[in-house]
Amino acid sequence: MKKWLEKVDWIYVIVPLALLGTFWVIAAFAGQWPWQSNPYNSYALQTDSWLKGRLDLGQNYEWLELAIYQGKYFVSFPPFPSYVLIPFVVLFGTNTPDHLIALAVTIIGCIYAVKLYREASAEKQHSLFWVLMLYFASGYLFVGMNGYVWFIAQSMSFTLSLMALYYTLRNKGGLALAFWACAVGCRPMLALYGILLVYLLVKGYKKENPKGTVWQLVKEK
């Protein structure tokens, strides 16, 4: 047991627990618990419509931000989160546990934030401090615990961007660009982020293969 505990990389325990504890305190004061229903569930409604064979929502929801075209009502936000919700809509219908999904996305993000910092920095002993600052010294906390349509897309785009950058630094171009594309499907302005990823991928490949070409990079990665 002692040997097993010595092998545990505790930062991967401390950071998620710190976030979950903070979210619990915020929820206690705000009265917004992660298992509560989500009135702004545009993505669940969109996914449900897809599974029923249509692109529009079938009716108006006055409290949601919808696009109206030829008398039909459509979700006006980028659609990637709706793909993530497919298995949840199959199980729960439109009453998906969006706040819990947002929490899970945030936890995955903080794990990749640790991995990214350790990949990018030589001062690995400071990773706990800087990862906590990334989440606690920004406006992310409210976003990260909230499953409303605007915020869950932000959470997913942030986590997917961290994953894309991590795999870029690991010179895994396929994974990096796949996660980047998913991030763009949450927030289209992240398309500009692709320029940085391609630059870093080419730079990393040239470092490993000084005589390699960009075409070889495309074929290999």
Where are these regions (language model features)?
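Start-transfer (signal-anchor) and selected internal transmembrane alpha helices
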Residues: 1-38, 128
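Interfacial juxtamembrane loops and adjacent helix segments
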Residues: 40, 44, 52-77, 117, ...
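Short hydrophobic/aromatic helix or loop-helix immediately within or flanking a transmembrane segment
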Residues: 48, 64-93, 155
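Transmembrane-helix motifs of polytopic, lipid-linked glycan transferases
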Residues: 94-124, 163
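Membrane-helix interface segments
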Residues: 94-97, 122-129, 170-176
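Multi-pass, polyprenyl lipid-linked donor-dependent membrane glycosyltransferases
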Residues: 101-104, 132, 140-168, 182-193
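Membrane-interface transmembrane helices that cradle and orient dolichyl/undecaprenyl
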Residues: 121, 161-175, 207
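Perimembrane helix-loop-helix junctions
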Residues: 192-221
